[in-house]
Amino acid sequence: MKLDSIDITHCQLVKSTRTARIYRSDTYAIKCLALDFDIPPHNAKFEVSILNKLGNKCKHILPLLESKATDNNDLLLLFPFEEMNLYEFMQMHYKRDRRKKNPYYDLLNPSIPIVADPPVQKYTNQLDVNRYSLSFFRQMVEGIAFLHENKIIHRDIKPQNIMLTNNTSTVSPKLYIIDFGISYDMANNSQTSAEPMDSKVTDISTGIYKAPEVLFGVKCYDGGVDVWSLLIIISQWFQRETSRMGHVPAMIDDGSDDMNSDGSDFRLICSIFEKLGIPSIQKWEEVAQHGSVDAFVGMFGADGDGKYVLDQEKDVQISIVERNMPRLDEIADVKVKQKFINCILGMVSFSPNERWSCQRILQELEKP
């Protein structure tokens, strides 16, 4: 075994979290998990079970090469090493806006008030959406579709859990989904016994990538939570700018883009409703039947605000999408842009029963 020949104490520590340490050894990544320190819903044994089940069958899932338990009750997982994740890739395409303000013009123009505060620095999104967006979208959908076909919900789809091939000079890098630490295998009796399918934990996903049904306590969710997370990633490609270096904005926010703030679910809920409208509780049956219906009605009323995106006429729906993802206008191919809009409108439903599956998205992408 390769792991038998690796001394982890001599490996480079790449990342450390509450539940895992990631090391690099040449062309390999080693994930070290403490078997006696699982923090639910993290579970090292279920993670290995899922990775072994997936094997090397999907080109968009980073394969597990080996696993090994140590005498210290740690579990070592060996993967191919990839240098960059999707969030870092998006970060590197935000460039500082170097347009300078002319102070003499302001002094000579009495109609412009003189202000003491310096202008807010802007960073412009220069990701080539014509080169990357469709390829990235298709690759991620194919990877998530494979998971769902195998009865697995990832539960933490985010750019940090999407790795890219080191060779970013190609037309479009190859993407790999990683980190199955909180994933859920609906076909694993041990996992469904510990966490019943109609009573799954809702402490899943990260920040802005949480699906709205989970935010309102629906425990019988399905793979639709992964589709929603993917929708938010898509929205990040099509934002124009940010005022904070290193921040990659999306169409919604949870307050974590503010300095010294970790964000909150309540602010995320308000942001989702501000951008996409509030449905009536009658049209959101999952929350009405299985979620925190009293909290929803108490805070937002039972009748909605009349602005829910999917209650609007089609042309209004499209304008809402384009307003929330302004760089869609930069896609040169009209058919590609229309495919994105159709898929986004299919993915944006608050009701997971109406939200498009990955297979439905792929059908749309395959259209001529």
Swiss-Prot record:
Pfam families: Pkinase (PF00069). Keywords: ATP-binding, Kinase, Nucleotide-binding, Serine/threonine-protein kinase, Transferase. One of its GO terms (molecular function) is cyclin-dependent protein serine/threonine kinase activity. One of its GO terms (cellular component) is nucleus. It catalyses: L-seryl-[protein] + ATP = O-phospho-L-seryl-[protein] + ADP + H(+); L-threonyl-[protein] + ATP = O-phospho-L-threonyl-[protein] + ADP + H(+). The active site is at D156 (proton acceptor). GO terms for biological process: G2/M transition of mitotic cell cycle; meiotic cell cycle; negative regulation of transcription initiation by RNA polymerase II; regulation of cell cycle. The keyword Transferase applies. It is an enzyme of class 2 (transferase). The keyword Nucleotide-binding applies. Its EC number is 2.7.11.22. Residues 1-368 form the Protein kinase domain. Belongs to the protein kinase superfamily. CMGC Ser/Thr protein kinase family. CDC2/CDKX subfamily. This is Serine/threonine-protein kinase CAK1. It comes from Saccharomyces cerevisiae (strain ATCC 204508 / S288c) (Baker's yeast). The gene is CAK1.
